[in-house]
């Protein structure tokens, strides 16, 4: 099943956390639709800001949004003008108090969403797909990835028949739950049609922390 299921959902509660943290006794559908509108608005507004993940927490009439981005300066703006304008627009969209927290992604080459978007942009610029995937995998491995797998599917290089191709480096153990596998799927809009890009990145194993047991004192002789 590890080969079929989404690796992010497979590891929820093990080494990954939920991106939406709230509970609703009633009006669940309305709250979920509001989440989707928030995510769509942020993805369109910050399309060039290398945004990977948007986490949403709710408490009463307040929404806390954490935006994970590789370009925090672009999101915040000079003197915080951009992020304040974004906060006001989201407050108007939801009719609730919105607080925005910006989280910087230190190593964007280890983030599957950002790696996939980088490959998709190169495909849209008519760069050969093998070259784009090879360069992306090499950068990820140099940044410290234990393994990476990239799948491209569609009319590759403008071929008449659609096909799939994979490029893999290192180890990507999808069945190992303690392995920190990041997964993302991105689409590239080319002149020949849509090309799907799937990225799996193995960032190493996350082992449970062992509690230090109190050391036994040696018993005295006399």
UniProtKB/Swiss-Prot annotation:
Q: Which GO terms describe its biological process?
A: translation
- Looking at the record, the residues that make up the KH type-2 domain are 38-106
Q: Provide the alphabetized UniProt keywords.
A: Ribonucleoprotein, Ribosomal protein, RNA-binding, rRNA-binding
Name of this chain's protein = Small ribosomal subunit protein uS3
- Describe, as the record does, how this protein assembles with itself and its partners: Part of the 30S ribosomal subunit. Forms a tight complex with proteins S10 and S14.
Record-linked Gene3D superfamilies: 3.30.300.20, Ribosomal protein S3, C-terminal domain
| HAMAP family per the UniProt record, alphabetical | Ribosomal_uS3_B
Alphabetized PROSITE patterns for the sequence: KH_TYPE_2 (PS50823), RIBOSOMAL_S3 (PS00548)
Can the keyword Acetylation be found in this entry's annotation?
no
GO MF annotation terms: mRNA binding; rRNA binding; structural constituent of ribosome
In which organism is this protein found?
Lactobacillus johnsonii (strain CNCM I-12250 / La1 / NCC 533)
Would you tell me the Gene Ontology cellular component terms?
cytosolic small ribosomal subunit
Q: Which family does it belong to?
A: Belongs to the universal ribosomal protein uS3 family.
One matching Pfam family is Ribosomal_S3_C
Q: Does the keyword Oxidoreductase apply?
A: no
- Mind telling me which SMART domains this protein's record contains? KH
Q: Sum up the protein's function in the record's words.
A: Binds the lower part of the 30S subunit head. Binds mRNA in the 70S ribosome, positioning it for translation.
Q: Name the PANTHER family on file.
A: 30S/40S RIBOSOMAL PROTEIN S3 (PTHR11760), SMALL RIBOSOMAL SUBUNIT PROTEIN US3C (PTHR11760:SF19)
